[in-house]
Amino acid sequence: MATYLDFESKIEKIQHEIVSAHAIANLEAVEKYQKELEKEIEKTFGSLSDYQKLQLARHPDRPYSLDYIKLLMDDAYEIHGDRAFRDDPAILCYIGWIGGQKTMLIGEQKGRGVKNKIKRNFGMPNPEGYRKALRAVRLAEKFDIPVLMLIDTPGAYPGLGAEERGQSEAIARNLFEFSATKVPMISIVIGEGGSGGALAIGVADKLAMLRYSVFAVISPEGCSAILWNDPSKVETATKALKITPSDLLEHKLVDDVLDEPLIGAHRDKVTTAEAIKTYFLESVKALRELSLDEMLDQRYKRLTAVGAYSEK
C-alpha cells in the first residue's frame, strides 16, 4: 500500500476516488479524476519547500541502494567484511555488470522493517563499513574497474564502539585514498547525504544528486537543536542549511542533478534506476577518454575547489 506524506493528502484522496470509480467500472469518473490528479500533482510538486524535499528524501518507500543493485546489476557478487574486524551490513559492496560495463558498486543501506533497520543500523555505517568500502575500491583499482557509489545515510554511526575502532580515521582514510584511486569514481546521492557518513564514499570524479535528495553537514533537527534549542525550527533550519540539489549545484558543491519522476523515485524505481545507469555509463565513457594523469588532475582540482569563494 502506498505511503503518502502530509502535503500529499489531496493526491491521496483523488487516488482513492479513482480506485472507487474503477471498482464500479465508472470510466467517465475515472477519466475525470485522472485529470484532477495530474493537475494536483503539478500544483503540489511544482512548489515544494526545502523541508518537503527533505521528507521525500527520507520517504519510507524511497528506493535504497539494494533496490538499485537489483535493478541495475547483472551477475552481481557481494563482497563481505573489512578483513580486520567484521562485516558491516550498513555498507554494501557488489561487483557485477551495469549495461555491459564491469562495475564495483558501493552503497549505504538503511533497511526496511524493524528487524532489517536494526540489522543495517538504520543506514549508519561503522568504521568497518568504510574500511570494507576501501577494500572494494582497492580491488576495483587492481582490476581497472570503475566505481559507482550510492550515498544514503543520516550519518556515520556515532556510538562509543565506532569511535574506539577509529570512525574518524576510517572516514579520513577513504577521503585520502579515494582522491588518488586510479579508476573512474562516480558518486550519487540517492536519498540522505549526512555529513562525514556521506563524504566517506563521496570523494569522486563526479558527484551527482537525485532531484529529491539532500546533502548536509548536519541534520536539520540537529541544527535546530543547536542553534535555536527549539525542535520546531526544523523547517527554518532546512532552508538555512541549503541542502537541496539546486542549492548545492549553485554553490558548485555537486556536478549534476539527476531527474527522477515528479512524484518521487518511490513511484517509479525503474525510471530512476535508468537515469542512474545512463549517468554512470556516460560519465565513465567521458573519463576513459582522458589519460590517467588528466583524470586524476581533474579530480584533484574539483576537490580542492570545494569551499573556495571570493569576497566582493
Curated annotation (Swiss-Prot):
Query: Transferase: present as a keyword of the record?
Result: yes
Q: What is this protein called?
A: Acetyl-coenzyme A carboxylase carboxyl transferase subunit alpha
Tell me which UniProt keywords the record has, alphabetically.
ATP-binding, Cytoplasm, Fatty acid biosynthesis, Fatty acid metabolism, Lipid biosynthesis, Lipid metabolism, Nucleotide-binding, Transferase
On subunit structure and binding partners, the annotation says: Acetyl-CoA carboxylase is a heterohexamer composed of biotin carboxyl carrier protein (AccB), biotin carboxylase (AccC) and two subunits each of ACCase subunit alpha (AccA) and ACCase subunit beta (AccD).
NCBIfam families membership: accA, AccA_sub, PRK05724.1
- The UniProt record lists the CoA carboxyltransferase C-terminal domain at 36-286
Highest taxon of the lineage: Bacteria
Q: Which Gene3D superfamilies match?
A: 2-enoyl-CoA Hydratase, Chain A, domain 1 (3.90.226.10)
